C-alpha cells in the first residue's frame, strides 16, 4: 500500500468574510464549478477567494457546515442546519434524538439536544442506496479559513482555484464528506429523480459511535435490509478503502503497598510491577502469533498497540500503592476473543504478583478487522488503520446469500493524517474530485439495483 501525504505548503492565512459580503471592486466573472483558472484583480485575493466559495453550491455548503461548531455532544446546531437545508431541497427528513455521551454530563443535562439526520426524497421513502457520515468533530474548535498557496498563483491576474486551501476543525473529518455526499446526491436526483437514495448523518462517531448504534437499533435499520448499498464517508484521500483494522481497548490496574521511599522494602511498588507488564504488552504486535503474540495479516500488516495513558503514585518519597495504564489495540487479524486471551496470557507471564494485577476490557467498541467492498472501477484502493462507524451499524444480512448481502463502501476527501490536528484542511480540488467519486459509487449502486 502506498501512502500519500500533502506536501507542506507555505500558506498565507486569510480570515473568512461572511458569505453575504462581496468585493466592491470591478472584476471579471469567477468560474466556480468549472474551469481551473479564476481571473482576479491584483491585490484582491481575499475577497475573490470568498467569491469562489460563495458561487459554488458545494463549497458554500461545506463552509456553512464547517462554521458551525459541532464538537461531540454539541451537534444540535449543525443538525438543525442540515434539516433546513435538506428540506429546502425537497427531502423528507426524520430527526432521531440521541442522548448525550459520557459521565462528564450532569444527569439533568442528558436530555436529547442532538439528533441523527435521516433524509430521503419524498418519492423514495425506502432508500436502497444510503450515503452516510458523521457531523460531530473532535475538540478544540478551529475557525474556518481560506488560504492560497504561492504555487496556486499563475500570474498577477489569475489563480488556480483547485489549489485554494480550506482549513478548520471538521473541514476534513468529516464535513467534507457530508457536503460532497449531499451535492453528489442532489446532482444525481436532478437527472434521475426516482433513484431510491437516502442520506444518514449521525452524531457521536468520535466518542464511541452512539449515534450509529442508536440508528442501528432503531426500526429504520430494517430486517432484512430494504437497502443494498451503504456508502460511508471518511477522509480516505479519495481512495476506495478495502478494509480497516479492528479495535480493542483495555486497562491494566496494579495494587501495591505504600511505604516511605527511604525504606522501599517495607512496601511494594505498583509502578515497578506494572512496567514489565507494559513492556510485554507493548511488544505483542512484534511477537509471532505462534510465540504468544497478536496476529498479523498480509492485508493489514501488524497488530499495533498504543499505551496512551499511564498513572501511578502520589509523590517521589512514597512507594506507589497503585498504578494503571490504558491501552488501545488495532487488530490486524483474528477475533476479539483470541486477542483478549493473548493479552491476558502476556500480562500473567510478566507479573511478579499476579494477584495484585487486574485487566479490564472495555464493554463496547471492540471488533475484529472490517473488510469492505472495493469492486467499483476507477479508484485507487487502500486499507486504513483508523476506526469508523462501519462496525457500529449492524446490517441484518447475516442470513442472506452472498449475492444478497449489503455492499459497504468507504470513501471520502482529505487525509486522516491532518484530520484531528491543528492543520486540518484540504483543497478545493480534493472536494470537487470527491463529488465525482461519490457520483461514480452511486452510479455503480444504481446499476446493481437495475440488475436485481
Curated annotation (Swiss-Prot):
Cofactor detail note: Binds 2 Zn(2+) ions per subunit.
CDD domains in the cross-refs: M20_ArgE_DapE-like_fungal
EC number per UniProt: 3.4.17.-
Highest rank taxon of the organism: Eukaryota
Record-level GO cellular component terms: extracellular region
Residues noted as binding Zn(2+) 1 in the record, renumbered to the chain: 173, 206
Protein's name in the database: Probable carboxypeptidase CPC735_001200
Keywords: Hydrolase, Metal-binding, Protease, Secreted, Signal, Zinc
Signal peptide: 1-17
Chief location: secreted
Cell compartment(s), UniProt: Secreted
Single GO BP term: proteolysis
Organism placement in taxonomy: Eukaryota, Fungi, Dikarya, Ascomycota, Pezizomycotina
Cofactor(s) needed: Zn(2+)
Disulfide bonding pattern of the chain: none
Family (UniProt): Belongs to the peptidase M20A family.
Residues of the active site: 205 (proton acceptor)
Residues holding Zn(2+) 2: 173
Gene Ontology MF terms: metal ion binding; peptidase activity
